[in-house]
């Protein structure tokens, strides 16, 4: 559903932020 999609996008966004910080 929509909520699941939002959760997935938030996970991707958080992962991108973590990757950016570590770089």
Curated annotation (Swiss-Prot):
Secreted: is it a keyword of this entry? yes
Q: Please describe the organ and tissue distribution of this protein's expression.
A: Expressed by the skin dorsal glands.
Alphabetic keyword roster: Amphibian defense peptide, Secreted
According to its UniProt entry, the protein's GO biological process terms are: defense response
One GO CC annotation: extracellular region
Q: Which GO terms describe its molecular function?
A: oxidoreductase activity, acting on paired donors, with incorporation or reduction of molecular oxygen, reduced pteridine as one donor, and incorporation of one atom of oxygen
Cell compartment(s), UniProt: Secreted
Query: Any keyword Disulfide bond?
Result: no
Family listed: Belongs to the frog skin active peptide (FSAP) family. Aurein subfamily.
Q: Give the protein's function.
A: Has no antimicrobial or anticancer activity.
Name this polypeptide is given: Aurein-4.2
Q: Name the species this protein comes from.
A: Ranoidea raniformis
